[in-house]
Amino acid sequence: MFANSAFVDGRDTGYQSMRSDVWKDTDDDRTGMLAWVFEDDFGFEKYCDYVMDVPMYFVYRNGTYVDVSGESWHDFMEGKLPQLPGDTPTIDDWEQHLTTVFPEVRLKRYMEMRGADGGSFEAIMALPALWVGLLYSSKSLDAAEKLTSDWTQAERDALRNDVTKDGLSTKFRDGTANDIAKEMVRLAADGLKERGLGEEVYLKYLQTVVERGSSNAARMSELNASEWKDDLSKVYEYATFPDVLPTF
């Protein structure tokens, strides 16, 4: 729904979210879909164990970033870092280390949903509205769980891999990713209406996307092929925020 990165180095890549596709080939130790988060015993402890097993990047000391690339957090806890012998981590060190993992959803003091490309003002407003509507309503959350509960790990991986190129037209079981997206937007709208704050208005962008069945990236690729003729300066004209932001 939010795919918006089709162009790289002045050309159409054929992908709707090249940004997302790049993450598929970036340091397996700290990126990707975490299969074990779908297991019944998943909790904070398992996530902490995962983060502690991720090789370190740096420690911030006295205004300086100390390079500890590849070192073990477990060794750090025992004061055994070669670069900082005897030094043990603080809570601030832990919070810094948390920023060096990049799974699809990153757990910090909140859940960071990392799947969306940047986009228009309307898309930026739609993103938190979507997740608030889905996650802050027990009815919508239960319905979303029911929708996805029988998906296999292989199906989740295939869907994540294929949507970077094919977007909402990606095949999934007897339908497409757009069928899932439509249901997500509907459930989010129900969740926002339940809150009674009128926030469902921010989903208009996504409602248009799923009714059309194609992302903004797909739309720009179509324009490039038909009107822009590889003059990608037109992308800036098309995507620049207006001087006066829209109201809802």
Indicate residue ranges for each PLM-predicted region:
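Loop-rich catalytic cores of soluble enzymes, especially ATP-dependent carboxylate-amine ligases
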Residues: 1-106
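A glycine-rich phosphate-binding loop feature that marks nucleotide/adenosyl-phosphate handling sites
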Residues: 10-22, 70-73, 148-154, 203-214
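Substrate-recognition/cap regions that form aromatic- and gly/pro-loop-enriched pockets
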Residues: 104-105, 114-202
